[in-house]
């Protein structure tokens, strides 16, 4: 092997090593920003495909319904404790802050936070789901004013 090919081989190896190191560093940096979505049942029994349980201390998002009768507010602060449930189980959630206006018992919510021991989620953010059928009053009024029924396709309009 001549000197020119040997130098080219070293350059290619250095570039590949640099790309590998860059990829590893990017993935390591993004690891802290990945929040996996779980339901309460998946926290208790694991993901359906892998049966993998989330670890205590893991950042995650949990989606479920607020269990009726479970909301407990601290009278001296903004702390709120409640339970999220689905068809397979429930988990407790603690949150300190102002809850969304649409938050209420029996309503769907998504909480983002950290899983603690005992299937307890320390939430940093609470997002309330709104009704997918909701239409603002202004839009509904405009739709009613501009609504025309389409003609039936099977009706003969030539006569």
UniProtKB/Swiss-Prot annotation:
Region of interest (Disordered), residue spans: 129-159
MF term (GO), any: metal ion binding
Alphabetized UniProt keyword annotations: Cell inner membrane, Cell membrane, Cytochrome c-type biogenesis, Heme, Iron, Membrane, Metal-binding, Signal-anchor, Transmembrane, Transmembrane helix
Protein localization: Cell inner membrane
Ranges of the Periplasmic topological domain: 30-159
InterPro entries: CcmE (IPR004329), CcmE-like_sf (IPR036127), NA-bd_OB-fold (IPR012340)
Record-level GO cellular component terms: plasma membrane
Primary localisation category: membrane
Membrane topology: Single-pass type II membrane protein
Membrane topology (Cytoplasmic): 1-8
Binding residue positions for heme: 130, 134
Bilayer-spanning residue ranges: 9-29
GO biological process entries: cytochrome complex assembly
Family: Belongs to the CcmE/CycJ family.
PANTHER family: CYTOCHROME C-TYPE BIOGENESIS PROTEIN CCME HOMOLOG, MITOCHONDRIAL
Task of the protein: Heme chaperone required for the biogenesis of c-type cytochromes. Transiently binds heme delivered by CcmC and transfers the heme to apo-cytochromes in a process facilitated by CcmF and CcmH.
HAMAP family xref list: CcmE
Listed name of the protein: Cytochrome c-type biogenesis protein CcmE
Lineage: Bacteria, Pseudomonadati, Pseudomonadota, Gammaproteobacteria, Enterobacterales
Gene transcribed to yield this protein: ccmE1
């Amino acid at each position: 092997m001549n000197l020119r090919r040997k130098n080219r081989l070293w350059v290619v190896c250095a570039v590949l090593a640099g790309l590998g190191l860059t990829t590893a560093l990017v993935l390591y940096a993004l690891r802290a920003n990945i929040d996996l979505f779980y339901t309460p049942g998946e926290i208790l029994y694991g993901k359906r495909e892998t049966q993998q349980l989330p670890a205590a201390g893991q950042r995650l998002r949990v989606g479920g319904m607020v269990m009726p009768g479970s909301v407990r507010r601290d009278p001296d602060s903004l702390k709120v404790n409640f339970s999220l449930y689905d068809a397979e189980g429930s988990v407790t959630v603690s949150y300190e802050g102002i809850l969304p206006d649409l938050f209420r018992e029996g309503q769907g919510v998504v909480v983002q936070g950290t899983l603690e021991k005992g299937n307890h989620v320390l939430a940093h953010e609470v997002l309330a789901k709104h009704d997918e059928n909701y239409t603002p009053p202004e839009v509904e009024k405009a739709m009613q004013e501009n609504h025309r029924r389409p003609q039936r396709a099977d009706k003969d309009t030539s006569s």
